[in-house]
Amino acid sequence: MALTNAQILAVIDSWEETVGQFPVITHHVPLGGGLQGTLHCYEIPLAAPYGVGFAKNGPTRWQYKRTINQVVHRWGSHTVPFLLEPDNINGKTCTASHLCHNTRCHNPLHLCWESLDDNKGRNWCPGPNGGCVHAVVCLRQGPLYGPGATVAGPQQRGSHFVV
């Protein structure tokens, strides 16, 4: 059953109200170019579901659960702000990217909607002060960035990513 725009907007409104309830965690992180910075992530605790309406989906992933017309829809909570965006860009599947590289973060300012190739490429990014070339700039250096890393990052081949 397809959702109406009103139903989608209701889900987004509910998500925006809920995301403010997540604890704000401060991280001191590498920004590239030898610089450090501070990021403020809204994190869901890993020990137990956070509040009514959340269900655990793996050790570090949670989904928001909402009933619409007596049908329970499970929304990937990172993708909720992007429900009105296209499912693909130039024929490539899209996903929510964490600009902060923190998979538990739900801060809307730390998320962007892009192709899975671009998302995976962020892992090799030198960071905002190290020469990030992404259309939406990373907030910190990628966790796999280091000697020999390329800014281009991997490309998807089947279900695997290769550099």
From Swiss-Prot:
Q: Which GO terms describe its biological process?
A: intron homing
Kindly report, in one word, the top-level EC class recorded for this enzyme. Answer: hydrolase
Ordered alphabetically, the record's keywords are:
Endonuclease, Hydrolase, Intron homing, Nuclease, Zinc
Work out whether the entry's keyword set contains Endoplasmic reticulum: no
Required cofactor(s): Zn(2+)
Molecular-function GO terms, alphabetical = endonuclease activity
Q: Which Gene3D superfamilies match?
A: Homing Intron 3 (I-ppo) Encoded Endonuclease, Chain A
Q: What is its EC number?
A: 3.1.-.-
Q: Would the keyword Chaperone turn up in this protein's UniProt record? A: no
Q: Which InterPro entries does this entry report, sorted A to Z? A: Endonuclease_Zinc-binding_loop, His-Me_finger_sf, Homing_endonuclease_His-Me
What is the stated purpose of this protein? Mediates the homing of a group I intron in the ribosomal DNA. Makes a four-base staggered cut in its ribosomal DNA target sequence.
Quote the subunit structure annotation. Homodimer.
Protein name from the UniProt record: Intron-encoded endonuclease I-PpoI
Organism (species): Physarum polycephalum
